[in-house]
């Protein structure tokens, strides 16, 4: 068994390994532990430090690495194992993480009271102001199992400095949960046995948005905004001019929902934003939409100082690019970030081999369902 090619996936922690042999049983399995009855090569791969799990189907493996591990160290060991070669360890400087920070809030009956940020190498926690904790305590009823009822709610992935992101998330939660909302959540918690907070959506006009003087009120408006249409673009463009990055980021999220080519200039604004989280969100939207008109903008994004943005741009060029993009790709072929470099190499290889640009996974699914 040999490796035919290695392909990045939409997840930085997963690589697709295409093999020379196809499974004969047409089954699929996920392997996480070394077990006697498993194929030897699977156990050999699981024995590699940094390999978390393996999904095996047809003629490929999807290998997940531990978040703290680095592909530049793990991938050569995978290659040598599958190709039955001896691996000679050489010193590599571990690649920095993508700047990704996982944000979570500890919730009790819909009331947040603690923030947790996690990177590949660090974790930081911060308690919300006392009135959040007091609200959480007021929401408790006799007989409540607090340990069972409290949950970590995923707030998505953020990008940047840990301290800056913590301050940003802290501000956001305070903005989204004013005292009157906390009081309402407490009342609901005390009046019902099981609390499943439902997202309430409310459409606002441009004038209503502009009349709000507090950015926290504006953020709540955007968070509670229903699926927008092109008729809402003036409001969303207004939000793109705000000083607060959370407002600009949420505006990009909403703009991406419109799914019309007319929104491209607004997503380009997001792609040039000074905040990396806004730029990455715009890149995600452009990737999901898959409009080839965005290719020049994504070529420019290969110069972004944040490697998570460059990686998204390289992924888009792999999904949508053609011969016209080869000069840009080749000029960035030595990107210092290993994952970005690998994605660029894959894009160059696909284009030079004349393989069809299939688009993102979401685009392929959408086309299949048409």
UniProtKB/Swiss-Prot annotation:
Gene3D superfamilies: Leucine-rich Repeat Variant, Scaffold protein Nfu/NifU, N-terminal domain
Signal sequence, renumbered to the chain: none
Coiled-coil annotated spans: none
Protein name: Conserved virulence factor C
Family membership: Belongs to the CvfC family.
InterPro entries registered for this protein in UniProt: ARM-like, ARM-type_fold, Nfu/NifU_N, Nfu/NifU_N_sf, PBS_lyase_HEAT, Virulence_F_dom
One term of GO molecular function: oxidoreductase activity
